[in-house]
């Protein structure tokens, strides 16, 4: 297992999308799951395309994050702040406020990118609800396919 990662399960083979999640402590699971479903809908992908839910290691026991992983029937992976901060240059929405609290400039986007791998791109940039954030990362080819589909629909 890579340095900085904690995971109770291995990932599903063959799928490529990683859902990065961040939330305040004690955020209702329903809020996080609804936001996660919105991220998938925004990307135009099915829940079955998801292979992993990822977040900051400080949220490794957060019921809402674990509930989201269970809801989508995928494992959860948690990364330390230094691992997420290594992705800062790739974040679409870095936040100094998030950095002050967590030690990294983005939890949802950073976790999605780390979980999806070095060649991954953000498919859905950070979206927010009252108490949570979500982002989706995966292969660059998927983002290109979605752009082509959107252009063809016009």
From Swiss-Prot:
Pathway participation: Cofactor biosynthesis; adenosylcobalamin biosynthesis
Coiled-coil regions listed: none
An example Gene Ontology biological process: porphyrin-containing compound biosynthetic process
KW Methyltransferase (keyword) present: no
Annotated signal peptide: none
A Pfam family matched in the record: CbiG_C
Keywords: Cobalamin biosynthesis, Porphyrin biosynthesis
Domain of life: Bacteria
Transmembrane regions listed in the UniProt entry: none
Gene3D superfamilies: CobE/GbiG C-terminal domain
InterPro entries linked: CbiG_hydrolase, CobE/GbiG_C, CobE/GbiG_C_sf
Name used for this protein in its record: Protein CobE
Taxonomic lineage from the root: Bacteria, Pseudomonadati, Pseudomonadota, Alphaproteobacteria, Hyphomicrobiales
